[in-house]
Amino acid sequence: MSESLARTERLGLVEVFRSLGPSAPTLCEGWRTADLLAHLVLRERKPVAALGILVPSLSARTEQLTLELASDFEANIRLFESGPPSWNPMRYLDALVNGSEMLIHHEDVLRAQPEWKPRVLSAQAQQEARRILRGAAQLMTRGAKVKVRPDPAGALTPANGEVVIRGDEV
């Protein structure tokens, strides 16, 4: 069996981090590549500290730890490349839950570069991205003024037929 979207996107991110270095821009407002990498390492290595991503009252501590982690870019690349540690359940769920996180953050880095061009995902990666999109469509569009649902091909179309959003997921 070939590697999961989470694994291939993780390895792609590692390659991009290594080639761009710690100071390259990202689409994550206010973050450079070192900051984004620190965020990813924090999620996997210090999950309790990462709660500030979801819990506003803990966000200051999470932000502080992210800044501290961002100082050792090369060590963070090695940690991130190895995936979640064995004590973290995410290590065993990586393929199921991290595909979207890795894909989105890989695009956050790639699209922030002046020479960015859309990339072509493998058929397997596209299929996995569609599966993720179908599962997340309602959550991602809950505030939309139109009703949105995934159509059989994986694109999003509104339930009432007024607006159509189509195209590659990436």
Stretches found by the model and what they are:
Residues 39-43, 62-66, 131-132:
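Alpha-helix boundary/capping detector
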Residues 1-3, 19-23, 46-60, 75-170:
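Structured surface interface patches that mediate subunit assembly and partner/cofactor docking
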Residues 4-9, 28-32, 64, 68, ...:
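Short, contiguous, pocket-lining structural segments
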Residues 1-52:
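An N-terminal domain-cap segment
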Residues 6-12, 69-81:
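Short, charged, amphipathic alpha-helices and their helix-cap/turn boundaries
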